[in-house]
Amino acid sequence: MMADSQPLSGAPEGAEYLRAVLRAPVYEAAQVTPLQKMEKLSSRLDNVILVKREDRQPVHSFKLRGAYAMMAGLTEEQKAHGVITASAGNHAQGVAFSSARLGVKALIVMPTATADIKVDAVRGFGGEVLLHGANFDEAKAKAIELSQQQGFTWVPPFDHPMVIAGQGTLALELLQQDAHLDRVFVPVGGGGLAAGVAVLIKQLMPQIKVIAVEAEDSACLKAALDAGHPVDLPRVGLFAEGVAVKRIGDETFRLCQEYLDDIITVDSDAICAAMKDLFEDVRAVAEPSGALALAGMKKYIAQHNIRGERLAHILSGANVNFHGLRYVSERCELGEQREALLAVTIPEVKGSFLKFCQLLGGRSVTEFNYRFADAKNACIFVGVRLSRGLEERKEILQMLNDGGYSVVDLSDDEMAKLQVRYMVGGRPSHPLQERLYSFEFPESPGALLRFLNTLGTHWNISLFHYRSHGTDYGRVLAAFELGDHEPDFETRLNELGYDCHDETNNPAFRFFLAG
């Protein structure tokens, strides 16, 4: 806030937030970002699609707005003591950049598994980095402890009125750039951006609908709305890490509950497809959470048959790990419903694959994985190009069933898409008493060694597959030879502390890998 104004606190009303947004001095650090028409997508979806380019900020995300708004309102005494926060991503860079502009010392606590590119970016903006903890929660606990011990001011990533007001400046720009919008789609992690955008728009132009978009595997706002209060998610997804928040903020929830018009969730494949749309239309390379709002917009348009409207979405960030783009490229066809993945049983005789392809009626086969395992039947993993999306996929399934083939649709099977497709043909030569688990490993030195020391010396590992996706965590698929009752194994899993899920009954595993 300006020197002659009082920072917000408590639970301000909408009018108070409006005044705070108007007074927020964010442009001492942030920029007015363009609102750009997506020509190709507008034509394809029969709506005017506009993108708010927050990737053009100095830190390549909207987080700078909220961080600077709060830090600029600190007292001289608070500034002298410095600030502290915990983050593995965009908020860390926003705080570091703001601290340099304000001449305030900033300590950013980041999990030890944080990618070097993110650590280097924070240091490049002038922030001091402390690597601590295996995850965000441990890093946050350390930051709060240091705040209390050394007098730092804690700068939260979303749940503070001044942070929310700072994010609300984006909405003010949006209305100044186009006052004829019908709907605005906003990504949600902790809710700071959604709260700020919604409260501002509803004060000035309440006829504009504000729709929140969440990742299906990190939908903390939806869970809170369903429960009537903020709740903890048992786990969050890793792909859209910028919105991977287990619990919505208290103040952000209060505002979202009051001012949002609707909410929609999308899966990772839809996010990948939206990232492709942004690149092809405006040559923006968004991070997954940055493309989240567009993914939700596309799904919302399809669900509600929207035509002829002016729709804006927020490209919230572009701090993407380059190595993660391989994963995006692989998955965007599925997200656009342009590919079907199928497990099909065909006779193990010459010409059977030719007959199968002929039945597909000239459709392109995008992927075919097979290895001889049985003299009578072959299980194949096949990808088929689609031109008419889900409707065509259903037609293919029906056609194959009518043709006498046993077929399982794996297009929505996460394990099949992530790992099994690269392992087809690895059946053991004899039956095994094995159980299959998927794990999320931190991408840090010693993670694999810890896994093997905890589990690999006590039980035989009969299958193992790891693949990096360019995020702070990797995905591992591992099978263990276990007896009928192995209580010690469950104990060891808990000791390991990695997020894991039993995948033994997964159809892709049964088709292609199980003994």
Give names to the regions the model predicted:
Residues 1-447, 451-515:
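PLP-dependent amino-acid enzyme catalytic core
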